Every structure is written in C-alpha cells, then in structure tokens.
C-alpha cells in the first residue's frame, strides 16, 4: 500500500498531518495519493517517460511511482489499496470453478493465460481478478489437490463446498494396497500397472540343474543357481541350517528323484570353506607325488644328456664326456658330486670325501694329498671380494657344518679365480 511518503500537491484537499519529502513535494501521512496524480503517473509512463523522470516532474517519491506502476501493470487498476482491514477475497467459488475448468481443458495453460481469459470472458474485472501468484496458489491447493483414497479402496474424495477437484487423466489409477499387499510399493504398484499371473515374480525361486549321469557315476554335481528377487536371509548358505530347510521346501519331489535330492543334501551340508588340516594333508600328498623317484628320473636324464653333450675347458682331461652318473634317491643324493661344482662337505661325524674325488675336480698341482677342507666364508674379510660370483652361489660356502682350517695354498688358489 502506498500510504507512506506520498507526495500530494493538493494537500489542501486532505487536511491532516503532512510534510515535505526530499523532492519538495507535499504529502499527507496515512492518506493515499490523489487519483489525479495517479492518472498523471500512468499517462507519463505510457508516453515513455522513465519512472525517475516522473518522480522529479511530479515531485513524488520514486518508491511511490514504482509501486503505482507495478500495480497498474499487474492488475490494470490505479486505485489505491484498502486502508485498514483485509482486501476482499477474489478467489470466490465461481472463480475457482472457472480456473478448474480452464485447467481441465488445457492442463498446460499458464497462470497469466488463465488471468487474461478471466478478464476476456468477463468473469472478473480489473479490480477483482486474482493475481498470477493467487492463480498458481489456487491451482496448487484446490484444483490439483492430492488424491487420498479411503481405506476401503473406494477412492471417493470429499471436497469442501464450492471447490472442484480435477481428476488427473494423465496418470492411471493406482491399485489399492488391499488388492496387492506385496507389490504395492514396487514399481508396478506405484505406477498402477496390472500384473498377470504369468508375469508375477516368484520370491525365493531357485532353479537347480543336475546331470543324472554325473550323479550315478560319482562325478561332480553341477548346480546353476538363478535367484529372482531373493530377500535377505533366504539365500542358501552351507553354514546355515535355515537356508537348507527353506531351500528344501521349494524343491518339489516330482521334479527331482530321490537320488538327486540326497545328492543335493550332501552338497548343502558340506561347509563352504575347506578345512585347514584337510588342505595341508592334500598339499603334502601332492608334494610327495611330485618329488617321487618316477617324477625326478626324466629331469635327471635331461641333465645327464646336457652334461655329456657339452665340454668344459676348465675341467681338462680329468673329466670325460661319456661319464654316467647313477640315479640316487633320498639322502644319498646329498653325497652325489656333479662336475663343475665344489663338493659338499658333510657335517662332522658323517664322513669325508676321498682324495680321488677331489683330484678329479681340480688339478692336483694346486692341492696337497690331504683331504680337502675349507673354512667358513666369514673367515675372509668380505664375501664380495671374489671376482667370480658363481663361487658365492655354491652350496659349499653356505653349509652349516663346522670345518677345519684350510692350507694357505688352497685359499690362494680360490683367490686367483
């Protein structure tokens, strides 16, 4: 309402407490602007004069001019608002019914189009036509009122007198919860799509495909699970007895034979995770079969053939190319000496190698006739000072058995490599 800061050039027409605004215009407190000034403001606006220029010419505050022009553009009226009390209600039952009728005929009609049509058909005039916001509120609260079905599923709504509810034709009716208690909150239940008996989803449905030939022959049982809409707790679990019982209830006797049902029971009673002790025993049995004598024989034959085919110039004539090595098993393999590698000295108390064995490995001019022995590799300053890394990888230097001191000539011979 424009009751404050109103410039009134004709203040004599409105006796009362008045004043002068910042533009020099005279106004009266609590009284609206005269209709003559209001009409002049609208005329200047139609002529294209800016609101700020209108305010200076008529010496009316800019806020007053903007409010009068805004109301005129919205309602087409230049009359002031009612002083005191509330303005008369424009959303009469007749107007609400017309708005509902327009919305029913054209659901996509905008509020400003409804307002123009109310004015064009003479339902309302410029003073009683509802605003755009009022029309939107009427459509939201009264015309498109949410549909609340009764508990008995009749779907009849009770409306206030004078108000009309527009039935929505765009969406199909939603089936009540009493007709479909399970699927009322599903997608089909929300959208109201009817479901036939053939398309009805089966809960806890399990399809088990078995091969009778494998069952009779003792082979593995092939199971293919197809779970459709399985709720929590109904999944078959090998550790849960309830899962076995619930699954057994769904398996019909006319579908599977007694032998197949017993095979299924054995599968379900078996734990889901293998036993630790059974797994270790299984691994030990596999390792025993892998390193048995029949399994090692082909590999040793390949080593013998490769050694016999190649010649090593470092060995000289002491090692012949046609030597054969017997196949040994168990602990005897530890005493077997292969050409090109230093011999393995057994621990104390297990015997030593004869001199002839050492003489066949290295030229005899570098060693004495005594049995060969060598100290631990820690007796030297650093192990990496050997130029030949093959010596460091030999099992001889990493043996845990204690050894006696070696002659200085033997150490010097290995240092020259």
UniProtKB/Swiss-Prot annotation:
PROSITE patterns noted in UniProt: PAIRED_1 (PS00034), PAIRED_2 (PS51057)
PTM-bearing positions, type Phosphothreonine: 226
InterPro entries in the cross-refs: Homeodomain-like_sf, PAIRED_DNA-bd_dom, Paired_dom, Pax2_C, PAX_fam, WH-like_DNA-bd_sf
Result after altering residue 133 to F: In FSGS7; decreased DNA-binding capability and transactivation ability
Region (PAI subdomain): 19-75
Name of this chain's protein: Paired box protein Pax-2
Tissue expression per record: Expressed in primitive cells of the kidney, ureter, eye, ear and central nervous system.
Signal peptide: none
Composition-biased stretches (Polar residues): 305-325
GO cellular component: centriolar satellite; chromatin; microtubule organizing center; nucleoplasm; nucleus; protein-containing complex; protein-DNA complex
Binding region for DNA: 16-142
Keywords, in A-Z order: Developmental protein, Differentiation, Disease variant, DNA-binding, Nucleus, Paired box, Phosphoprotein, Transcription, Transcription regulation
Organism of derivation: Homo sapiens (Human)
Region of interest (Disordered), ranges: 304-325
Gene3D superfamilies: Winged helix-like DNA-binding domain superfamily/Winged helix DNA-binding domain (1.10.10.10)
């Amino acid at each position: 309402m424009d009751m404050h800061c109103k410039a009134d050039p004709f203040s004599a027409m409105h006796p009362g407490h008045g004043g002068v605004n910042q533009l020099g215009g005279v106004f009266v407190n609590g009284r609206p602007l005269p209709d003559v000034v209001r009409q002049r403001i609208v005329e200047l606006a139609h002529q294209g004069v800016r609101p700020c220029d209108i305010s200076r010419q008529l010496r009316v505050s800019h806020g007053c001019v903007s409010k009068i022009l805004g109301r005129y553009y919205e309602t087409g009226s230049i009359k002031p608002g009612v002083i005191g009390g509330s303005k008369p209600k424009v959303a009469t039952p007749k107007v609400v019914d017309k708005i509902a009728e327009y919305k029913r005929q054209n659901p996509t009609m905008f509020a400003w189009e409804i307002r123009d049509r109310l004015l064009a058909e003479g339902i309302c005039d410029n003073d009683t036509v509802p605003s755009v916001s009022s029309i939107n509120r009427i459509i939201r609260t009264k015309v498109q009122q949410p549909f609340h079905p009764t508990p008995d599923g009749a779907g009849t709504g009770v409306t206030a007198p004078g108000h009309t509810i527009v039935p929505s034709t765009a969406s199909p009716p939603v089936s009540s919860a009493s007709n479909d208690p399970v699927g009322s909150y599903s997608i089909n239940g929300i959208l109201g799509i009817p479901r036939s008996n053939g398309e009805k989803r089966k809960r806890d449905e399990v399809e088990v495909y078995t091969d009778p030939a494998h069952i009779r022959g003792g082979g593995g049982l092939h199971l293919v699970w197809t779970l459709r809409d399985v709720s929590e707790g109904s999944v078959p679990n090998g550790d849960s007895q309830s899962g076995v019982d619930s699954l057994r209830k769904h398996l019909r006797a006319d579908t599977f034979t007694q032998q197949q049902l017993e095979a299924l029971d054995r599968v379900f009673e078996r734990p889901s995770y293998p036993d630790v002790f059974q797994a270790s025993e299984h691994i030990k049995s596999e390792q025993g079969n892998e390193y048995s004598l029949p399994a090692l024989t082909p590999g040793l034959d390949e080593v013998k053939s490769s050694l016999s085919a190649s010649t090593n110039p470092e060995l000289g004539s002491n090692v012949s190319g046609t030597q054969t090595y017997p196949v040994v098993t168990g602990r005897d393999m530890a005493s077997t000496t292969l050409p090109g590698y230093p011999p393995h000295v057994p621990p104390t108390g297990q015997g030593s190698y004869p001199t002839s064995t050492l003489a066949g490995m290295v030229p005899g001019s570098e060693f004495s006739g005594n049995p060969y022995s060598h100290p631990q590799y820690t007796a030297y300053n650093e192990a990496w000072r050997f130029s030949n890394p093959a010596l460091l990888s030999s099992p001889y230097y990493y043996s845990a058995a204690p050894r006696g001191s070696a002659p200085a000539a033997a150490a010097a011979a290995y240092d020259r490599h």
